[in-house]
Regions:
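Activation targets extended, charge/polar-rich intrinsically disordered C-terminal tails
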Residues: 2-50, 238-331
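Glycine-rich catalytic cores of cysteine/serine-nucleophile enzymes that process amide/ester linkages
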Residues: 107, 112, 118-215
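Transmembrane alpha-helices and immediately adjacent membrane-cytoplasm interface residues
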Residues: 47-85
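Short amphipathic alpha-helical segments with coiled-coil-like heptad repeat character
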Residues: 100, 112-120, 268-273
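A short, structured loop/turn motif at beta-sheet edges
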Residues: 102-106, 160-164, 225-230
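Soluble catalytic domains of enzymes that build or remodel membrane lipids, polysaccharides, and related
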Residues: 188-268, 274
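Alpha-helical transmembrane signal-anchor/signal-peptide segments
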Residues: 83-103
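Short, glycine/acidic-rich beta->alpha junctions
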Residues: 92, 149-151, 262
Length: 331
């Protein structure tokens, strides 16, 4: 016989699962009919409410629990059939999937995006292949691009190979043609995950020079650590990129996004940092790394952020071949 505490815990677990299942059915990516999605989501929500009420009614309790269990199992079976795919009609900027070839001394990235943008939606497409010597990896930069105040940002990294140049890696939503992003639908398997490997003139300049409707403010921070730590981080990224080629993944607004994917990869590094709520709110990721001693601590964070603001320098550099050097030029 369940105690009062046991009933409370059972009710909370059912509430959590039932709320997710109801919302998932309301936003089911494989059910085109809005009316059917509403019917299924509403029915599950009604069953959840009935089950929770029945917890206080001994005569109805276990019958309601059995019905809820059957519905939950049916939902899980149906939800497991929603699988990510590499075979869709993708937007041009995520049409190709990056992959990496690793040897003892080099790393080669295939399908490196190097678009020349005229506007956010107009560009000359170019996809490259780039090879770098691992012994020339000098460090890693973190870019944080803000467009809705301090809390909301897109975070990506760039690996510095010195005279060989730099390569940026950005974890993004792989949108289909005509598809728009929604943070709510991003919780329910609507979008695949994309690892965009790109030239900085592509991924930085797009945000600083062309996105004007919601202007983005882009900041660059140099991560502390040894070249060996940077190499661990790079190789972890490369393995994850290759794994996504073999087995596509879903993007998730909370669990598999630009910020916590970077943290997961960094956790493989001997110099990893502990998880924090600030990594869930992407705009505070850089500040958290500063607090953990992973950014230059010789100046206050506000000053480091001011010095790292790259918009004006990126706009001045524009298409220049030395774009990356110019966005890093001291004031």
């Amino acid at each position: 016989m369940l105690t009062v505490m046991g009933l409370v815990l059972l009710g909370l677990s059912e509430l959590s699962f039932g709320a997710y299942a109801s919302l998932a059915l309301l936003n089911h990516p494989n059910i085109a009919s809005t009316a059917l999605r509403r019917l299924l989501g509403g029915a599950f929500a009604l069953l959840l409410a009935t089950t929770l009420v029945a917890l206080s009614l001994p005569a109805w309790r276990w019958g309601a629990q059995a019905a809820f269990l059957v519905a939950a199992l049916l939902f899980l079976v149906a939800w497991a059939r929603v699988e990510p795919s590499d075979d869709r009609e993708w937007m041009s900027d995520v049409a190709r999937t990056a992959r990496a070839t690793i040897t003892e001394t080099t790393i080669t990235f295939h399908n490196v995006r190097n678009f020349d943008y005229h506007s956010p939606t107009e560009f000359d497409e170019a996809w490259d292949e780039r090879t770098y010597r691992l012994d020339r990896l000098a460090g890693v930069d973190l870019f944080s691009s803000h467009w809705m105040g301090p809390a909301v940002a897109h975070v990506f990294v760039s690996f510095d190979f010195g005279v060989d140049g730099r390569i940026a890696i950005s974890v993004e939503v792989r949108r289909e043609r005509g598809e728009t992003f929604s943070w709510l639908r991003g919780l329910f398997r609507h979008f695949e995950l994309a690892f965009v490997v790109a030239d900085e003139r592509d991924v930085v300049r797009l945000r600083t020079n062309h996105r004007k409707r919601q202007p983005e403010q882009v900041y660059r921070y140099r991560l502390t650590g040894t070249p060996e730590m940077a190499r661990h981080f790079l190789l972890a990224y490369a393995r994850r990129i290759n794994a996504a080629v073999e087995r596509p993944e879903f993007y998730n607004t909370l669990t598999t996004n630009c910020t916590n994917t970077v943290w997961e990869l960094a956790e493989m590094n001997p110099g990893r940092v502990p998880f924090s709520w600030k990594l869930m709110i992407s705009g505070y990721a850089a500040e958290y790394l500063y607090d953990q001693g992973r950014l230059d601590s010789s100046v206050p964070f506000a000053e480091l952020t001011r010095l790292g603001h790259v918009n004006a320098r990126a706009q001045a550099a524009d298409r220049a071949p030395d774009f990356s050097e110019r966005v890093r030029a001291p004031e």
